[in-house]
Regions:
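Active-site rim loops that border cofactor/substrate pockets in soluble metabolic enzymes
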Residues: 56-58, 64, 89-110
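Rossmann-like dinucleotide-binding cores of NAD(P)H-dependent redox enzymes
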Residues: 21-78
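Beta1/beta-strand and adjacent pyrophosphate-binding region of the FAD-binding site
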Residues: 3-14
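Cofactor-binding loop segments of dinucleotide-utilizing enzymes, especially the Rossmann-like FAD-
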Residues: 13, 36-40, 167
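A conserved short coil-to-beta-strand element within the FAD-binding core of flavoproteins
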Residues: 73-85, 93-97
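FAD-site-proximal beta/loop scaffold in flavoenzymes
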Residues: 1-5, 98-172
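A conserved FAD-binding loop/helix module that cradles the flavin
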Residues: 17-22, 27, 159, 165-190
Length: 191
């Protein structure tokens, strides 16, 4: 994938998203925008995440310092194409409202939509676990105690025709580990 001269959109505000921002800049992207569905975290200490919880604070990496537009509270709704080429992504502003039962805040779409021009998009989201609705549920895949897809050493799922790898199996980790997992499963598929 070559980012030279492209309008790059990175969907996801974590470490993997930061890696995508840096790589796009080093490839010579025309512009790089990074969006995150969550609110912008505070700088410094966050009273909402005291020790020993994972600290939710604003992180500005060396990749961000190389240059990008960073935006928060945006959900991606759809990709927009023209003549088989991506030209943008429709995004919508979201709000986070307290849960009636006191649990995690709930996302509410505001109806405020816009198009972010992009001809290359990197998907770098999903820190907690794979989405259970959709493929996992429809294919009746078994999951482990952390809701990751359960596999054997070769990457087979409970459905013997399907393999899984990367963060969907291990949980959030480094990109290089996901790549290694993908290569190992590819070898299993090739056998």
């Amino acid at each position: 994938i070559n980012c030279k001269g492209k309008k790059v959109l990175v969907i996801g505000g974590g470490d993997t998203g930061s890696d995508c921002v840096g790589t796009a800049n080093r490839h010579g992207a025309a512009c790089v925008t990074q969006i995150e569905i969550m609110p912008q975290p505070p700088v410094g200490q966050n009273p909402a995440t005291p020790w020993p919880m994972y600290p939710q604070v604003l992180k500005t990496s060396s990749s961000h310092e190389e240059g990008c537009i960073r935006r928060w509270n945006l959900a991606s709704n759809r990709f927009i194409g023209e003549k088989n080429n991506l030209i943008g992504v429709e995004v919508e502003e979201v709000e986070w409202v307290p849960s009636p039962d006191g649990g995690r805040p709930q996302m509410r779409q505001t109806g405020k939509k816009e198009i972010i021009e992009a001809d290359l998009v990197f998907l770098a989201m999903g820190f907690l676990r794979p989405e259970q609705e959709g493929l996992i549920k429809e294919l009746r895949l078994a999951t482990d105690n952390r809701d990751n897809i359960a596999v054997d050493n070769a990457g087979y799922t409970a459905n013997s025709n399907l393999f899984a790898c990367g963060d969907a199996v291990s949980g959030a980790s480094l990109v290089v580990k996901a790549m290694a997992s993908g290569r190992n499963v590819a070898r299993s598929i090739d056998r």
